[in-house]
């Protein structure tokens, strides 16, 4: 991953790098890989995340439709 540093503005480049890493999900992946996760735990976590996403999408859909 590359970020351009313009006019020696390192702070702005770091901010852009953090934003890119956040968008790519690198911080989340680093957090998950700090410790070993058993395959069964991974499946349970992914299933819970899928349920959470489905509920969120349903709430958004109902909010848009006005029910």
Swiss-Prot record:
Gene3D superfamilies associated with the record: Ribosomal protein S8
Gene Ontology biological-process annotations: translation
UniProt feature, compositional bias: Basic and acidic residues: 37-52
Keyword Transport in record: no
Pfam short name (any one): Ribosomal_S21
Annotated region (Disordered), positions in chain: 37-67
GO MF: structural constituent of ribosome
UniProt feature coiled coil, ranges: none
Keyword terms of this UniProt record: Ribonucleoprotein, Ribosomal protein
GO cellular-component term (any): ribosome
Protein name, entry field: Small ribosomal subunit protein bS21
